[in-house]
Amino acid sequence: MFQAILAIIPILWLILSLAVFRMRGDLACFIGLIITLLTSIIGFHFSIKDGLTAGLEGAMMGFWPIIYIIVAAVFTYNLTTASGGMTVIKRLLMTITEDKRILVLILAWGFGGFLEAIAGFGTAVAIPASILVALGMKPLRAALICLIANTTPTAFGAIGLPVTTLAQVTGLEVKQLSVIVSLQLFILIVAIPFVLVSLTGEGKRPIKGVFGITLASGLAFALPQILVSNYVGAELPSIIGSLFCILVTILFVNLRERGKNASPVGGDVAFKEGIIRCLPFILVFFFIMLTSSLFPAINQLLAKVSTTVSIYTGEHAKPYTIKWLTSPGTMIILATFIAGLIQGMSFKEIGSILAKVLNKLTKTMVTVASIVALSKVMSYSGMINTIAVSLVAVTGGFYPFIAPVIGTLGTFITGSDTSANVLFGELQVKAANNLNMNPYWMAAQYDRGNCRKNDFASKHCSCSGTYWFRRSRR
């Protein structure tokens, strides 16, 4: 019991520092790493050398692939914004229908899901909310709707980063884990559009007249996500699901409003201009798909370009492999550079945008590297196993009901589905093994809890709250 108390000290520190003391994320996580190292050495007889190399391996994993993908995703979004692409996308979406319930399905649910899938970091809340406010919706309601919409898409956000990270820290096969996560999210994905429409509509029957479109919007997101998870992996489910959702919803709108004097989809945006401005996202989609396991010949050829290093010096050490060309980060950056050049931007302009992204995400890099290093030290020293055994002993067969709550807590503390998966992901597999349960279902159940709480994660609340405050002051 004493060791279990020692093992949760780093987690208690993160809860207190981030949720109570409101300390900066990078500082809190770095101090948490120091506390974890000291606890592992003093309380778990972990050698200094093993502790430092475990932390170094974790930091390396934090930078590659996690931080690398984050930088790449934000780079794509910022370049698209700088080139005027986001303005064109807004114009395309704003000319479809005047029914705010349907606009919420397209903007908050479909377009927001796409932004979460391609970039994350609050863009999926801030941008759709700003468009909804521009269309006449009250800022607080727009923020609330976009926060709720941005729950289930986070599981495969930032090119599938949360699920791929969860698979990496737990040792589970990523494609199988992706499928189970998609299956567990199915009911929520179908249900959330109805919640959004209910919050948007006026009167006692807000669903009246849009039930079919709302159901189609949910199914169009959920079904492709399951299929893509099964055949491709974790990188594209939310991207393809959100695109299908937008297309199907627009198709239903066109069928519904046929014969009415409705504005044509796209308004005054020429087809060629729309393609050019959306090119970064289009190329990212095709590059990731072509280099995925869906095309094994290309995937296996590129996977040969790799570097293997031995970092951790203790028991059960495994070499760490960096696959340079099959990483989504590499494909995203390459696609974005090519798209920028086609759009007429110079290498200097594109490089400047990337440099600004790197500068802006410095604190995020420290946060992610520290929390992954902390997780690795806890794992290798036996702290995670001690917590798992203690939790199973206390909760017994009820632990599967506790797993989503832990996911909820992890996302609320760290503000990130990915960071929560790093922090508590291995704990779920250890607990599942102790209970003789399927570790894939337990890990997916935990990740579902992450999604539920993601709408109240610090970065999303601050993003939407800041926008609402600025609008209310005008």
From Swiss-Prot:
Keywords: Cell membrane, Membrane, Transmembrane, Transmembrane helix, Transport. Its main location: membrane. It is found in: Cell membrane. It is a multi-pass membrane protein. The chain crosses the membrane at residues 4-21, 28-48, 63-85, 105-127, 142-164, 177-199, 209-231, 238-255, 281-303, 324-346, 387-409. GO terms for cellular component: plasma membrane. The keyword Transmembrane applies. GO terms for molecular function: lactate transmembrane transporter activity; solute:proton symporter activity. Plays a role in L-lactate utilization. NCBIfam families: lctP. Belongs to the lactate permease family. This is L-lactate permease. The gene is lctP.
